[in-house]
UniProtKB/Swiss-Prot annotation:
Motif Cx9C motif 2 boundaries: 122-132
UniProt entry tagged with the keyword Transit peptide: yes
Name of this chain's protein: Coiled-coil-helix-coiled-coil-helix domain-containing protein 10, mitochondrial
Organism of this sequence: Homo sapiens (Human)
Residue ranges of the motif Cx9C motif 1: 102-112
Summary of the function given for this chain in its UniProt record: May be involved in the maintenance of mitochondrial organization and mitochondrial cristae structure.
Composition-biased stretches (Low complexity): 1-20, 80-90
Domain spans labelled CHCH: 99-140
PROSITE patterns (UniProt xref): CHCH
Substitution effect: S59L: In FTDALS2; results in disorganization of mitochondrial cristae
Biased composition regions of type Pro residues, renumbered to the chain: 21-39
Pfam families associated with the record: CHCH
Keywords, in A-Z order: Amyotrophic lateral sclerosis, Disease variant, Disulfide bond, Mitochondrion, Neurodegeneration, Transit peptide
PANTHER family, per database record: COILED-COIL-HELIX-COILED-COIL-HELIX DOMAIN CONTAINING 2/NUR77 (PTHR13523), COILED-COIL-HELIX-COILED-COIL-HELIX DOMAIN-CONTAINING PROTEIN 10, MITOCHONDRIAL (PTHR13523:SF4)
Gene name linked to the record: CHCHD10
Length: 142
């Protein structure tokens, strides 16, 4: 006896449905999908600018740390150290003007971090950038 309350004999045998005299109606052609509502997330340009700022900061910190470690392990010499000649990277294509809520702060911080050998001098620009990102909802402060 089956476990359920119905027995197998009480179910009618299913038959395939007879073909309909009318063909099934085709669904109406769909209109263009509605544009998604803005989600409050930063746009592509803002994300690219933030990523570029992070890359530049990481590069600057890496260069400072690398030169500090190299200087510490290379031993002292009586000659003053020669500053490394920095070449500005040549962009393959002209970069569009960065637009975004914190573009000015990003530019100021990047300019400072690329021209100063001591990144502690750029701390004010870093704080201004953090405040701008927080104010515009692009990040949360720790």
């Amino acid at each position: 006896m089956p476990r359920g309350s119905r027995s197998a004999a009480s179910r009618p045998a299913s038959r395939p449905a007879a073909p309909s005299a009318h063909p099934p109606a085709h669904p109406p052609p769909s209109a263009a999908a509605p544009a998604p509502a803005p989600s409050g997330q930063p746009g592509l340009m803002a994300q690219m600018a933030t990523t570029a700022a992070g890359v530049a900061v990481g590069s600057a910190v890496g260069h400072v740390m690398g030169s500090a470690l190299t200087g510490a392990f290379s031993g002292g010499s009586s000659e003053p150290s020669q500053p490394a000649v920095q070449q500005a990277p040549t962009p393959a294509a002209p970069q569009p003007l960065q637009m975004g809520p914190c573009a000015y702060e990003i530019r100021q911080f990047l300019d400072c971090s690329t021209t100063q050998s001591d990144l502690s001098l750029c701390e004010g620009f870093s704080e201004a950038l953090k405040q701008c990102k927080y104010y515009h909802g692009l990040s949360s402060l720790p």
